[in-house]
Amino acid sequence: MAAQDPRTKFKTTDYEKQEQEVPGLQSEMTPAPDCGETSYQGNQRLQGYKMLVTGGDSAIGRAAAIAYAKEGADVAINYLPSEEQDAQEVSQVIEESGQKAVLIPGDIRDEQFNYDLVEQAYQQLGGLDNVTLVAGHQQYHDDIHGFTTEAFTETFETNVYPLFWTVQKALEYLKPGASITTTSSVQGYNPSPILHDYAASKAAIISLTKSFSEELGPKGIRVNCVAPGPFWSPLQISGGQPQSKIPTFGQKTPLGRAGQPVELCGTYVLLASEESSYTTGQVFGVSGGVQID
């Protein structure tokens, strides 16, 4: 039997408690998330494609960007300037895969930057075939009184508004056959009481995915969503979870462990590729068995 037991394929023992300031750096995590730097093997399923990935410096966005490159695509990634160290690592992997890497730092909470981001990606890549929206903000609070208006606003200004602005601009360049991939979460279906704003923002992304798909399907553009479960990432150790939950993070899933970002590569590649030519408006759960409905 060639397949590995999914319960033990990756780390199953407790993680070390570790805390970073927002947004967190993958390069300073112990252990570093596996984003497919050496573990993902491509098969030229996206040869010639031009891709834009937000949040492409670490964890899920990094895994998508690396997988796209290993499948033959040129990739532009967006990230915060403070994440330059992680972004440079991604750029190196993309270039070692024989593909073009375009780095576009900036804060997606700035509306104009989102328009400029798409324009720069299109110009520097020489086209645009897929936009993958991963960048997100997550901060836990112990109870409802901890969720200030400012906290809610920051979450939606990071998780929801940029998605809308980026898609608006990208439609100037996306042709029939192109695709958009959004990133929600199991929190969009099973909200945690310590993540009211984050969960609500992820539910909004599911709704936008479906409404976008209704509008853009007749134009030949597919829109789908990935809903990850608990994945080991800088998001968790920079205030996304209480420190008390870090050691056993992900262990309550049916598979008994947190996911590694590389385990999302296949889903992002599938949704961007011709293999999903009849798939739009769908949400794909990659959750270790946590149910979405």
Task: Pin down the residues of each PLM region.
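Active-site helix of classical SDR
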Residues: 167, 201, 209
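Residue(s) in the substrate-gating loop at a strand-loop-helix junction
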Residues: 185
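The beta1-alpha1 cofactor-binding region of Rossmann-like NAD(H)/NADP(H)-dependent oxidoreductases
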Residues: 84, 105-118, 149, 262
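Conserved mid-core segment of classical short-chain dehydrogenase/reductases
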Residues: 14, 110, 115, 123, ...
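Catalytic Tyr-X3-Lys loop
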Residues: 129, 145-164, 181, 205, ...
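Short C-terminal tail/terminal secondary-structure segment
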Residues: 29, 37-38, 268-269, 280-293
